[in-house]
């Protein structure tokens, strides 16, 4: 009881001296607030002492007590602030304002209303101090007139105070269990619990309002005394980090860093940033460029650094150095550009500096923004109220807040440039895609033309690979017409393939009769193949299957040796005098006397489906003028006429194997030696009663093959000399 009264009387004495009617003693007020913050005095007793002092009738004492209370509220810690926001203290103030007895002094009343308004404004958003706001709103509703509002941040009520003690069963440094012999002790700096071995050191803690030496653990002692040299022990470093984490989790005001290197460095950086913001033309943070040139000064500054703040300071210094280098490079670029412009336009106009965007942020402003962001991010991990003890941060915040319109305009221009860039990139991508497609199309076209160049397909042949390849050499240097008669002997021919579909007739497959020699030609001059004459229906595209021919008795067979054909000497004399089929165009247009109006033409189906090839040299295409089809009469089949005229003429560039039947003598000039395996083809169906020596006057089938020589003998003027020579052979 005596101790309690003695402590209360000690605080009361200090309060009486601080609130005397004389001038305000600021130093004594701060001492009282340090006692409250260090928890040397219970916060409730301090609140009651101030409440009793307000009962004094002297207005000066009341005003001094209100000022002392405001100082203790701003520096006494959250535990004392909770007592001030209690109903006991606030209701006492309201009762003083609403008393009906002795009226309250006007100055005291105004001061009281001002403090209530400031405390309520600073306590917004804090649930433990909500009664301050309720009292303020109640007084407003009752009609009290408050002075103009002052914008006060809630951090003004924050202050550093000793943390709350944490209980544990083991030492939080060496993990040794506590026992009857191993007592637990609390560190006054961090609030953690340690044994006697880990907390045997004592230090005063002025940043917490503790001026006398108190017990601290080894980690806090190393941190507080390592301002001149960094801790060399790894365990101390880990313990220091553990204490910092524990203290941050406790959400208590920060520890012994009021006089640490972080505050000094932060204050110095803020001061330099403000100077740069005010003086836009300055060269920036000059001392940062001299760090490498002054190692002694750097070492001195490093001695005052704290370990956890080294990274932040290094980042700030690096950013300042980068900004300085960027400014130098920019200035050099401006000078070079100005010099180049001056040299090029010296005769016309003076050199003008590059146009600068008025909304572009200067390097100093950009650096201030980055510095403020780094500081805010760093202070987020600090206890509440730390930012308020540094007025330079508030000034930096105000200077950066003025840059918001400028930053918004710059951001808008950057976004428009970005959109333009995206549009141009999309257009460029489209153009490149179209260009690649064009290149691919041209490349494929070039490949197709290159592949076609290796084997040229004839223009009029729908089936270019239908016939086998024929040798191109001509034996003994004889002409194409003579090669038909100087080749190997004609062997048996293979039967043709039964194909019911016709193929287009080539112009060079049609061998037209030339001008017949004068005088009759004997039918016995050429031996015709002996074969049966089947009944052939009219040409309608459905040809019957070709059967193997049976030899006929009255027919004269082919000779087995080539002696039956004209010899070389006779043929040379005879066929050299024979007119060329294309020399007389009138030979195709008008028939001769005694001939029928229908000219016999070999069937295109017979020539297309023929698998015969010459045993010797192939028939070489004549390089003369194109051959013309002879006119046909009404007796020819209309289907055959339409089919023969509807297909293109085959190109003469490729030799075509042919089977030339033994027909009228003019067609015998072009008879071709055939391969060995062969069979006769169907012939024309002869009209009953038709005289020998004339063509049939009825339907002429295009697939008709040569029949007996008398069927195809043509009445024409003869040449006796040639006939006699052939008969002799």
UniProtKB/Swiss-Prot annotation:
InterPro entries linked to this entry? ENTH_VHS, HGS/VPS27, UIM_dom, VHS_dom, Vps27_GAT-like, Znf_FYVE, Znf_FYVE-rel, Znf_FYVE_PHD
Q: Where are the transmembrane segments?
A: none
Q: Which domain of life is it from?
A: Eukaryota
Alphabetical list of SUPFAM superfamilies matching this protein: ENTH/VHS domain (SSF48464), FYVE/PHD zinc finger (SSF57903)
Bias-annotated ranges (Low complexity)? 333-352, 650-661
The cysteines joined by S-S bonds are none
GO cellular component annotations, sorted alphabetically? endosome membrane; ESCRT-0 complex
Principal location listed in the UniProt entry:
membrane
Keyword annotations of the record:
Endosome, Membrane, Metal-binding, Repeat, Zinc, Zinc-finger
Q: Where is the composition biased (Pro residues)?
A: 551-560
Does Metal-binding count among this protein's keywords? Answer: yes
* Listed PANTHER family: VACUOLAR PROTEIN SORTING-ASSOCIATED PROTEIN 27 (PTHR47794:SF1)
Please provide the record's free-text comment about the domains of this protein. The FYVE domain is involved in the binding to phosphatidylinositol 3-phosphate (PtdIns(3)P) which is required for the association to endosomal membranes. Both IUM domains are necessary for efficient binding to ubiquitin.
Name this protein carries in UniProt: Vacuolar protein sorting-associated protein 27
Which gene codes for it?
A: vps27
């Amino acid at each position: 009881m005596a101790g309690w009264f003695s402590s209360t009387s000690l605080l009361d004495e200090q309060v009486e001296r601080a609130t005397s009617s004389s001038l305000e003693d600021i130093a004594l007020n701060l001492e009282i607030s340090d006692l409250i913050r260090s928890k040397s005095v219970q916060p409730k007793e301090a609140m009651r002492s101030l409440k009793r002092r307000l009962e004094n009738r002297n207005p000066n004492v009341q005003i001094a007590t209100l000022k002392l209370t405001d100082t203790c509220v701003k520096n006494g810690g959250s535990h004392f602030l909770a007592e001030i926001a209690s109903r006991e203290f606030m209701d006492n103030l309201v009762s003083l304002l609403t008393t009906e007895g002795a009226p309250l002094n006007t100055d005291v009343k105004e001061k009281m209303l001002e403090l209530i308004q400031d405390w309520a404004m600073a306590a917004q958003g804090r649930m433990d101090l909500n009664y301050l706001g309720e009292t303020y709103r109640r007084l407003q509703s009752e009609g009290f007139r408050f002075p103009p509002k002052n914008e006060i941040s809630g951090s003004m009520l924050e202050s550093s105070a000793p943390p709350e003690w944490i209980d544990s069963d083991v030492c939080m440094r060496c993990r040794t269990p506590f026992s009857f012999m191993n007592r637990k002790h609390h560190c006054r700096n961090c609030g953690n619990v340690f044994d006697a071995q880990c907390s045997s050191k004592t230090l005063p803690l002025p940043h917490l309002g503790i001026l006398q030496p108190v017990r601290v653990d080894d980690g806090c002692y190393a941190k507080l005394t390592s301002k001149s040299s960094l801790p060399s022990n790894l365990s101390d470093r880990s313990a220091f980090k553990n204490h910092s984490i524990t203290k941050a989790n406790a959400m208590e005001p920060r520890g012994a860093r009021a006089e640490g290197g972080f505050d000094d460095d932060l204050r110095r950086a803020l001061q330099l940033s403000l100077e740069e913001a005010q003086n836009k033309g300055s060269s920036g943070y000059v001392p940062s460029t001299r760090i490498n040139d002054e190692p002694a000064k750097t070492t001195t500054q490093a001695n005052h650094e704290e370990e956890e703040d080294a990274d932040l300071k290094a980042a700030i210094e690096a950013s300042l150095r980068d900004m300085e280098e960027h400014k130098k490079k920019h200035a050099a670029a401006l000078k070079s550009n100005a010099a180049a412009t001056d040299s090029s336009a010296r005769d016309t106009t003076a050199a003008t500096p590059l146009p600068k965007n008025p909304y572009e942020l200067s390097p100093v402003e950009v650096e201030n923004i980055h510095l403020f962001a780094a500081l805010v991010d760093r202070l987020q991990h600090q206890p509440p109220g730390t930012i308020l003890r540094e007025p330079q941060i508030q000034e930096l915040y105000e200077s950066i807040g003025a840059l918001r319109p400028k930053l918004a305009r710059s951001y808008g221009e950057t976004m428009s440039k970005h959109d333009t860039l995206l549009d141009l990139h999309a257009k460029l991508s489209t153009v490149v895609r179209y260009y690649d497609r064009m290149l691919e199309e041209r490349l494929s076209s070039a490949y197709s033309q290159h592949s076609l160049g290796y084997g040229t397909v004839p223009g009029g042949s729908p089936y270019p690979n239908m016939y086998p390849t024929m040798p191109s050499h001509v034996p003994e240097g004889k002409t194409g017409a003579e090669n038909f008669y100087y080749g190997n002997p004609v062997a048996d021919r293979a039967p043709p393939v039964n194909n019911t579909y016709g193929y287009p007739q080539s112009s060079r497959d049609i061998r037209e009769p030339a001008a017949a020699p004068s005088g009759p030609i004997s039918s016995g001059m050429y031996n015709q193949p002996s074969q049966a004459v089947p009944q052939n229906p009219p040409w309608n595209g459905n040809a019957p299957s070709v059967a193997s021919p049976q030899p006929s008795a009255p027919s004269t067979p082919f000779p087995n040796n080539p002696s039956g054909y004209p010899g070389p000497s006779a043929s040379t004399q005879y066929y050299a005098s024979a007119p060329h089929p294309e020399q007389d165009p009138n030979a195709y247009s008008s028939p001769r006397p005694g001939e029928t109006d229908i000219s016999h033409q070999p069937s295109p189906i017979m020539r297309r489906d023929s698998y015969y090839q010459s045993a010797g040299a192939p028939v070489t295409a004549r390089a003369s003028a194109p051959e013309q089809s002879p006119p046909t009469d009404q007796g020819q089949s209309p289907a055959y006429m339409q089919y023969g005229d509807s297909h293109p003429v085959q190109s003469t560039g490729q030799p075509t194997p042919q089977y030339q039947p033994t027909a009228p003598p003019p067609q015998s000039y072009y008879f071709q030696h055939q391969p060995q395996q062969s069979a006769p083809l169907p012939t024309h169906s002869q009209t009953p009663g038709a005289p020998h020596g004339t063509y049939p006057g009825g339907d002429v089938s295009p697939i008709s093959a040569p029949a007996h020589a008398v069927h195809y003998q043509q009445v024409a003027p003869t040449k006796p000399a040639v006939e006699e020579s052939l008969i002799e052979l």
